UniProtKB/Swiss-Prot annotation:
One of its GO terms (molecular function) is thiazole synthase activity. GO terms for cellular component: cytoplasm. It comes from Salmonella typhi. The active site is at K95 (schiff-base intermediate with dxp). This is Thiazole synthase. It catalyses: [ThiS sulfur-carrier protein]-C-terminal-Gly-aminoethanethioate + 2-iminoacetate + 1-deoxy-D-xylulose 5-phosphate = [ThiS sulfur-carrier protein]-C-terminal Gly-Gly + 2-[(2R,5Z)-2-carboxy-4-methylthiazol-5(2H)-ylidene]ethyl phosphate + 2 H2O + H(+). It comes from the Bacteria. It is found in: Cytoplasm.
Amino acid sequence: MLRIADKTFDSHLFTGTGKFASSQLMVEAIRASGSQLVTLAMKRVDLRQHNDAILAPLIEAGVTLLPNTSGAKTAEEAIFAAQLALEALGTHWLKLEIHPDARWLLPDPIETLKAAEALVKQGFVVLPYCGADPVLCKRLEEVGCAAVMPLGAPIGSNQGLETKAMLEIIIQQATVPVVVDAGIGVPSHAAQALEMGADAVLVNTAIAVADDPVMMATAFRLAVEAGLLARQAVPGNRSTYASATSPLTGFLEALA
């Protein structure tokens, strides 16, 4: 069970809604993933119409919606987008994204911290997408963010946990949930994140662009479950030397 702010989730896999070939395929993949928290970009939906092609199927699916501010380049733009989302969807939950460079889509740490502090004061449940910077993540936690969402690699790159060393520090020092977001390309990346101690992962591109998104969503669900079980089982310590699983000489002594 994963608790963030006032909500609890059985699934430790969060999903996105971009890049799917159709809304029907999107919903089928989300259902196969078991995800209960789904993020969607405010810039991609018609907030005035709940029968929007993306929004309506998600509402019908009964998942918790996590609007995001993707496309915002400044704290002011992100705050404005958050207020629009609150008015349209009636949720204080928000994935805060501010990335001014469209080529790399890396989060702006200064604007993110500035916006997070303001939004928390306005009553939002803020989940900020941020760089894998332990100092920044601690600052975001201190201003009241409900979780932190450090990147594993650039958005949509499928590179995996390129920031592993920094993620380990973030996980070790965090007192709020850590959700690894961005760059996760295959299910083994997700399993590794959970094994490391991450509370959840958010996956979009890797599922949406697969030849079979529904099958890939299922694979991610199983990988996240496996990673969590492995962590709970407490793996053995890593060793420099070999350690035999059975006596090396006992059978020889028995023959003597």
